[in-house]
Amino acid sequence: VIGGVECNINEHGFLALLYSRRFQCGGTLINEEWVLTAAHCDMRNMYIYLGVHNVSVQYDDEQRRYPKKKYFCLSSRNYNQWDKDIMLIRLNRPVRNSAHIAPLSLPSNPPSVGSVCRVMGWGTITSPQETLPDVPHCANINILDYEVCRAAYPELPVTRRTLCAGILEGGKDSCNGDSGGPLICNGQFQGIAYWGADTCAQPREPGLYTKVFDYTDWIQSIISGNTDATCPQ
């Protein structure tokens, strides 16, 4: 996260670290057995840490898990094509809630343009050169009109299952390593970080976030055992 500050140790109990030999992505614990992240964060030999604040300090209640099963939203038969950048991971066993671990519930209504949102992660705090912090950083950004992102990135599809969020004048943004992590607006989990410009936090080049609200039915169906649930078109 660019332009942020160290997150309060008590505000990110749902934030997961996804590793495969090294730190790759963030994720969000949505109940004791499930983590939501971005599809492009999928990797082999993944393991997931919860309850971490400083990566160089071991916490008593830190818990490590593996994916038992991964669910994707594939919109076509081309399995290499992530049209919808969302992945739901069932953990190999549930985590216990503790001082530093608590899930974040799914949103009950969609966010509105202008909402103030908190983005968080262990991604780089400088750009384009990368500096990975030991602690997660948090910043407040705004939901912007989707047309701001379409103007910045003309190749974007017209689809609205994506949130455009940032600061118009630049200076605060998610960045490399924050992918898969949450965007929280008015206390609700509204977005999953997935894409932005090569240099982060530039004016008029906001970040893109998968719109969690549009996928809540799909997520809840899978969690309740209907693993053939279809994604929103």
UniProtKB/Swiss-Prot annotation:
Expressed by the venom gland. GO terms for biological process: proteolysis. Keywords: Disulfide bond, Glycoprotein, Hemostasis impairing toxin, Hydrolase, Protease, Secreted, Serine protease, Toxin. This is Snake venom serine protease ussurase. It comes from Gloydius ussuriensis (Ussuri mamushi). One of its GO terms (molecular function) is serine-type endopeptidase activity. Monomer. Disulfide bonds join 7-138, 25-41, 73-231, 117-185, 149-164, 175-200. It comes from the Eukaryota. PANTHER family: KALLIKREIN-1 (PTHR24271:SF47), KALLIKREIN-RELATED (PTHR24271). Its main location: secreted. It is found in: Secreted. The active site is at residues 40, 85, 179. Its EC number is 3.4.21.-. It is an enzyme of class 3 (hydrolase).
